[in-house]
């Protein structure tokens, strides 16, 4: 039971104001909570930085990575995963971008460069088209960004320690796979790395944003207008309708009936993961038609509410 917010006792007359303060705090918030035994705890609000590396594992030379957002603040942790994959000599990779709405272009370059390894040296990761006025200043030449394998500036290092040199990967996708997630798919296909898509059609966001700071009086604003469209090394960038899966599986209705959830990430009760495993092994993996009825108390809900799509940010 929540009894106080910012030292203000909750009453029937102020409950709505307290609720608003709780869900949309304008300043640090302190709350008091009383448990069933009457013991009172004080909880202070603070920033939480969620690690986008949700899960990773290696099983029989197959690497599996669940990545929820391209957050450059966690690039070291991401690179460490690829170094682990390389140290275990994986030969196959399942990249799970089902709930990844995008993020930093730099992190998309990191993950793409580690996947490609030596195959991407001195090759184009992406080129960018801006509006007509800006393109005139650039001589109507799209600026090119190389794969960062040889030198990744955000970590001030080469990515060779995590380079996998893979010519094919399996990517799990949904409509929530957007922007920088699609940039990775497009960039790898641009250098002839086969990206097998399993799931449903991706969102279709081939444009990105740049941050602009504005000041109005004493107020400061940080805006992120859409300013560019991204293309791969082959000049392809028209994926505004999304990428169509090679193997279409709706994770909510894989067998024609609604699935409430699956087991842990990397479990073969997950039909998308199971399909990737079957394609790699050549053996069909059967997923239960009623996973929701099995050990329901242990369920990890996969069919999450739609996440905010944070876009492709330079």
Q: Where are the language model's segments positioned?
A:
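Conserved PDZ fold ligand-binding element
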Residues: 1-16
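Solvent-exposed coil/turn segments that connect beta secondary-structure elements
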Residues: 7-8, 36-38, 46-48, 68-70, ...
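A broad structural signal for short, well-ordered beta-strand segments within beta-sheet-rich domains
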Residues: 2, 50-54, 87, 166
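PDZ-domain C-terminal substructure recognizer with occasional recognition of PDZ-binding tails
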Residues: 17-56
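C-terminal "post-core" interaction segments
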Residues: 62-65, 69-80, 84-92, 101-314
């Amino acid at each position: 039971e929540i009894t106080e917010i910012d030292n203000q006792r909750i009453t029937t007359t102020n409950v709505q104001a307290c609720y608003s303060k709780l869900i949309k705090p304008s300043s640090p918030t302190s709350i008091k909570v009383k448990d069933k035994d009457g013991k009172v705890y004080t909880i202070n609000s603070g920033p939480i930085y969620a690690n986008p590396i949700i899960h990773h594992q290696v099983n029989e030379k197959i690497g599996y990575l669940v990545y929820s957002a391209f957050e450059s603040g966690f690039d070291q942790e991401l690179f460490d995963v690829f170094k682990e994959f390389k140290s275990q000599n994986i030969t196959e990779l399942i990249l799970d971008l089902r709930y990844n709405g995008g993020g930093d272009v730099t992190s998309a370059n990191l993950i793409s460069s580690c996947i490609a390894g030596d195959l991407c040296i001195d090759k184009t990761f992406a080129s960018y088209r801006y509006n007509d006025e800006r393109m005139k200043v650039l001589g109507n030449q799209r600026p090119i960004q190389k794969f960062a394998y040889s030198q990744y500036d955000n970590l001030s290092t080469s990515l060779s320690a995590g380079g996998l040199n893979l010519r094919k990967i399996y990517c799990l996708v949904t409509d929530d796979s957007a922007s920088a997630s699609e940039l990775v798919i497009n960039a790898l296909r641009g250098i002839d790395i086969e990206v097998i898509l399993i799931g449903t059609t991706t969102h279709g966001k081939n444009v990105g944003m740049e941050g602009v700071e504005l000041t109005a009086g004493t107020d400061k604003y940080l805006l992120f207008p859409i300013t560019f469209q991204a293309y791969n090394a082959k000049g392809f960038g028209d994926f505004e309708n999304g990428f169509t899966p090679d193997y279409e599986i709706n994770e909510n209705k894989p067998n024609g009936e609604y699935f409430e959830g699956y087991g842990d990430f990397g479990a073969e009760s997950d039909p998308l993961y199971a399909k990737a495993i079957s394609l790699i092994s050549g053996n069909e993996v059967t997923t239960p038609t009623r996973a929701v009825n099995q050990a329901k108390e242990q369920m990890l809900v996969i069919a999450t509410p739609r996440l905010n799509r944070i876009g492709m940010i330079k």
